[in-house]
A protein has these predicted regions:
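OB-fold nucleic-acid-binding modules
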Residues: 1-211
Length: 211
């Protein structure tokens, strides 16, 4: 199965998947630095991204970036949420929740194959971002934090929104995108860098905001 196949078979509410199908993905996220919590982002063979919710910490120890993973879909739940495929267990009757730790190994099977992260990253401009890149690894070059952000840290308790801080980066043409940092991130208290450079991360969406 592909992500496109799964999205066609899924709706806006969580539904149980009953077929004995397997979805293959390559991990593009890591919770090692504390900025991702109980989620894994992957891409299928076509490069389409999707997300799996797992009720476990330190998922990077088993499902590190570049690791090929086989997802046995039978009896899991799927949903299209904010324009992207979500896979997990059932929560609150209609939503995707986290797969219980005790059965994660039954559904997520590690391959011996690990590919270089460079083969998975999409090097794009901020103006290129769209739902097609959701839950994929993206990289922007020649970007910087907005002038009014400089002097602060990645995370600020005075700008806390749901346990994280949104900062804005801008490119040479004035296009902007949000960089979201959790209070639990290893770099939460690091000062924002000055000057231009590269930034790499996983694209997600919350309501109308891509971040």
């Amino acid at each position: 199965k592909s992500v496109d196949d799964m999205m066609k078979a899924s709706g806006s509410s969580a539904s149980k998947y009953l077929e004995d199908d397997v979805l293959t993905g390559y991990v593009v996220s890591s919770d090692e630095g504390g900025n991702i919590y109980k989620n894994i982002s992957l891409v299928d063979d076509s490069g389409k991204g999707f997300n799996i919710s797992l009720d476990r910490y330190d998922n990077y120890t088993s499902y590190e970036p570049g690791r090929k993973v086989y997802i046995k879909l039978n009896n899991l739940y799927t949903q299209v949420d904010f324009g992207a495929l979500e896979i997990g267990d059932l929560y609150n009757n209609t939503q995707i929740g986290r797969i219980p730790e005790i059965i994660i190994g039954d559904h997520l099977l590690r391959s011996c194959e690990v590919v270089d992260e460079e083969t998975l990253v999409n090097k794009i401009s901020i103006s290129d971002i769209s739902d097609k890149y959701l839950h994929t690894l993206i990289e922007f070059d020649n970007v910087q934090f907005k002038d009014n952000e400089i002097g602060g840290n990645y995370y600020s308790s005075s700008k806390d929104l749901g346990g994280a801080t949104n900062r804005i980066i801008v490119d040479e043409l004035g296009y902007e995108v949000i960089v979201r940092t959790s209070s639990y991130s290893d770099f939460a208290n690091n000062p924002l860098p000055t000057g231009k450079g590269k930034i790499r991360g996983v694209l997600t969406r919350f309501n109308t905001c891509l971040l």
